[in-house]
Amino acid sequence: MVYCFLKRNILTSILYTNCVNNERFKIQIYHHFSTMAAVLKHWREAATLLVVAKTSKLIPNGVNGGGLQLAGTGSEQSQYNYKMLMLKRSTKSKFMPNVYVFPGGIAEDADFSAEWLDLYKKFGESESKELLKYLTSAGAGPPMFSRTRDQEFQHIPSELAFRICAIRETFEESGVLIARSIEDKSHLNSDYPRKPVWGTSVPMETQVSDEWRKRVDKNPLEFIKMCRTLNVIPDVWSLSEWTNWLTPVTLSSTGKGARRRYDTAFFMCVVDHLPEAMHDNNETVHLKWIAPDTLLSEYSHSKGLLAPPQVYEVHRLLHFQLVEDLHRFNWDRALNHRVRQYFPVVVGCEDGIVVVYPGDELYPEEPDRIGESPILTVKCSLEDLPKRYPSMNRMVVAGHHWVNTSAGDGQVIPDFEWTFPESLQPKL
């Protein structure tokens, strides 16, 4: 493979919208920027949660007048028996404004607090030991899980801390609290973790929920206090790893959010009902429960913006019409494979550029994660690229994805060949 170099002066926003993975890492780029648990020199660590809720067959999609998404309202029918929780970011957001995303956010020192270990031990010694054993049973994960942290943040494994972060942020942004009573040990018997664990959500009075959401948003340590007060514990048992995305290096230092980068763990939690949820009117301004096919139909017809990782990941979900199949697949996959870090790399061609992901034969062995090297280029036209480099996991500038190979982490290949069912076609 012959690479030449192209100056970093094209396409100021394409990398803002895409990400890719890699298996080999240069340790020297992970120096700390401060003593905070999840802050590095070039990016911050974060967690997000795919909350997948089982519905009855062919439940229509819709939103009621108050902004609370409920089953049984609307007209469009889905081929899927589940919906995902999606939140629209505020136009004032410094990162990806006005875009629909999964709930989530930046990890805080409180997520790594030793108080959590005490709380989980209170839940049960044997359950805690099995949990900690399960979290790393598939081996070492990508850097955000496996790197060594400052001693004050080593009380609990990163795998546990980022799950707590995902649950905390989901509660702050949507009011959905994935937790279980301190007395509830159901589904955590000798079969755990061989069988998928369904998530549990804690119902709360709106006034109580709103008060705690505000308190936790102002001070993440309040999340621990809330759990103690309500006698609940974050249901980390039901969260399985889904993927890991690192925001790419932008080609311009200008623009809203251009310098903001995040190494984000994506988790999945499957629940057997649609929990009541409401956006926070701060970071998020709209909320909806929506099936994957309906979401992509809306996106393709310009009815809403999606963050690029969401576009890629939701296309994976298209393989699973039944939530039971999705749950079993990802649970078994997570038992045997750790996620890989998806970090997008731009490759220049003679007449354009593509963004390549892990598994693509154009993906470099040592990608430049901090933007010190010129953009890689290949002497080939876009038209000839699939012929010369047929193992593809890439995106063309126009937004089209060419994917026929996996990243080697046990995940399914996104179904970009999917077409809209007749019931979801736009009405002319």
Language model segments and positions:
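N-terminal leader/linker segments that precede catalytic domains of diphosphate-processing enzymes
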Residues: 2-428
